[in-house]
Design a protein with these regions (language model features):
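A generic fold-level signal
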Residues: 15-17, 53, 126-129, 160, ...
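Short, structured interface segments
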Residues: 168-197
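N-terminal strand-loop-strand
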Residues: 2-71, 203-208
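Short His-Asn-centered micro-motif
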Residues: 72-73, 80, 251-253
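Unchanged
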Residues: 76-179
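Active-site-proximal alpha-helix that buttresses catalytic centers in soluble enzyme cores
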Residues: 200-263
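Short acidic, glycine/proline-rich loop/turn micro-motifs
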Residues: 70-74, 113-116, 215-220
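Active-site loop signature of alpha/beta-hydrolase-fold enzymes
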Residues: 66, 106, 212
Length: 263
């Protein structure tokens, strides 16, 4: 029996619902911090990395239907990518406009276990939910307005879907998260923070859209343009890049690269 992946529609004998979400984090600027010093009075090298968690808060949501605390997430809409769904769903469920950071990981569990505390079944013969997770950070409302045309509409979730949103410490989230799989994602988030993810900047490398074949192009290679198919690819790329809220775009001087960015 072969599973068929889809965006929430029944297809074949086994249904795999694709979904996406994120661990939304922020700094608690009101926290005064803990002093971590060695015996000689100098701050230890490990203290600076551990101190990241002193001021760090993550966002969890309560779903009244299941009476559970979980990460903001949701199913993909028709023709939607996981990246776009992650940003849209987190923004809709928390009311906070966000941008994606590093990819964290994925979880999978039978749909029948939705809302249950333990979700570790690997039965491939039952309907399944498959979820990808990223790190995400809040962005300014002005940035959200600026990217709105590229990203598309975001509609706040109603109270019947999400009735409470809380910012809590990592330690508190570990206690409050209802599901074992969500705690697995939290562990991956902690690993990324310990690796220095909060101190890094996002760099995206993007290939140009489909260009005219070299064998058919009679001009110089730097003037070889994108095709109508390439223009369509470039247009759809706009929505994907908006998920990361880039602040600067740099392109090669070659025409096909410039056309990809300009679309």
């Amino acid at each position: 029996m072969q599973p068929v992946r889809h965006n929430g529609r029944v297809s074949g004998e086994v249904k795999i619902v694709e979904a996406a979400g994120a661990v939304l984090y922020r700094r608690n600027t009101d926290f005064q911090g803990w002093l971590k010093f060695s015996d000689d009075g100098r701050q230890t090298s490990a203290a600076s990395r551990l101190a990241d968690f002193d001021t760090l808060e993550v966002c969890i949501v309560h779903r009244p239907k299941y009476d559970d605390w979980s990460w903001p997430k949701g199913k993909l809409e028709l023709n939607e990518t996981h990246r776009h769904a992650a940003v849209r769903e987190v923004s809709e469920e928390t009311g906070v406009p966000v941008a994606l950071g590093p990819f964290l990981g994925e979880i999978e569990y039978p749909l029948a276990e939705e809302g249950k505390k333990t979700r570790r079944s690997k039965d491939r013969t039952v309907d399944t939910k498959h979820i990808l997770f990223w790190m995400a950070r809040p962005i300014d409302p002005e940035d959200a307005v600026r990217r709105a045309d590229a990203f598309g509409p975001v509609h706040r979730a109603d109270v019947g879907e999400i009735d409470s949103v809380m910012w809590v410490s990592v330690q508190c989230a570990r206690r409050m998260l209802t599901h074992s799989t969500d705690r697995d994602i939290l562990a991956l988030f902690v690993d990324r923070v310990e690796e220095g993810a909060l101190d890094g900047d996002m760099l995206l490398l993007v290939r140009h859209g489909k260009a005219e074949p070299r064998k058919q192009w009679t001009g110089t290679d730097d003037k070889r343009p994108i095709t109508p198919r390439g223009a369509s690819m470039a247009y759809s790329l706009d929505r994907e890049l908006a998920c990361y809220n880039p602040t600067r775009l740099i392109t090669s001087p070659w025409l096909r690269c410039q056309q990809t960015i300009q679309m």
